[in-house]
C-alpha cells in the first residue's frame, strides 16, 4: 500500500518534527514555514535563501544572523524571528514532554496553534477527503503519544510496554524514518506497520 509518509498531511507534520530535531534541515524548514501559511512569502524566503547561501548558513541559522537586517525588510525579519522563536519553543517543550497524556496535550495544542485542521479544510475542496486527512493526522499524533507513554503495538497488534520517552526522542525516530522515506528507497518503503515496530 501507500507509504504512510507519502500522505501530504503526514509529510507536513514530519517537516515540523524534523525541524525540531535538526534546525539545519532546510527542506523541512521550507515546508514548515509555508504549511500552513504564516504570512512569510516567497520573496522573503528567496532573499533568506540567498543570504544563507552567501554566508554558508542553514536557513534557520540565517534567521538570527545580525547582518540579516541589511538583506531583508524589518517586517519580514520580525515574521521570521517569530517563526524561529516558535520552533525553538516547540523543540524545548518537546524535549521536556514525557508520557502519553502530556504528549497528546502538547500535540493537540501545537496543531491548534499552527491552525492545521483549518488549513486542511481550507485547502481541500472535498470535505470528506479533508476529514479523512485530519483523521490521519489524529492517528499519527495518537501513535506518537502512545510511544511517549511506552506503549508499542508489535506487527501482530499485541501491545507491549517499554520505558517512557520524551516527545523529542519519538520525533527523532520519526524524523529518521521520514528522511529515509523521502530519499525514495524503493525497497525500504516505510509503512504504518514499520512505524509500529520502530
Q: How would you label these PLM feature ranges?
A:
Residues 1-4, 13:
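Conserved RecA-like ASCE P-loop NTPase motor core of nucleic-acid helicases/translocases
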Residues 7, 14-198:
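Conserved helicase C-terminal RecA-like lobe
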Amino acid at each position: 500500500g501507500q507509504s504512510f509518509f507519502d500522505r501530504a498531511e503526514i509529510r507536513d507534520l514530519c517537516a515540523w518534527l524534523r525541524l525540531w530535531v535538526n534546525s539545519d534541515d532546510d527542506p523541512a524548514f521550507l515546508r514548515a514555514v509555508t504549511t500552513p501559511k504564516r504570512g512569510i512569502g516567497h520573496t522573503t524566503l528567496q532573499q533568506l535563501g540567498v543570504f544563507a547561501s552567501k554566508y554558508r548558513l542553514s536557513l534557520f541559522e540565517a534567521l538570527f544572523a545580525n547582518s540579516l537586517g541589511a538583506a531583508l525588510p524589518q517586517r519580514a525579519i520580525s515574521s521570521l524571528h517569530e517563526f524561529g522563536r516558535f520552533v525553538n519553543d516547540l523543540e524545548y517543550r518537546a524535549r521536556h514532554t514525557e508520557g502519553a497524556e502530556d504528549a497528546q496535550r502538547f500535540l493537540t495544542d501545537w496543531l491548534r496553534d499552527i491552525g492545521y485542521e483549518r488549513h486542511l479544510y481550507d485547502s481541500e475542496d472535498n470535505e470528506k477527503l479533508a476529514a479523512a486527512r485530519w483523521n490521519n493526522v489524529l492517528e499519527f499524533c495518537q501513535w506518537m503519544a502512545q510511544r511517549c507513554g511506552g506503549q508499542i503495538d508489535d506487527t501482530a497488534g499485541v501491545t507491549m510496554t517499554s520505558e517512557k520517552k520524551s516527545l523529542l526522542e519519538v520525533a527523532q525516530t520519526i524524523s529518521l524514518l521520514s528522511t529515509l522515506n523521502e530519499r525514495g528507497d524503493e525497497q525500504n518503503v516505510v509503512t504504518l506497520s514499520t512505524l509500529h515496530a520502530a
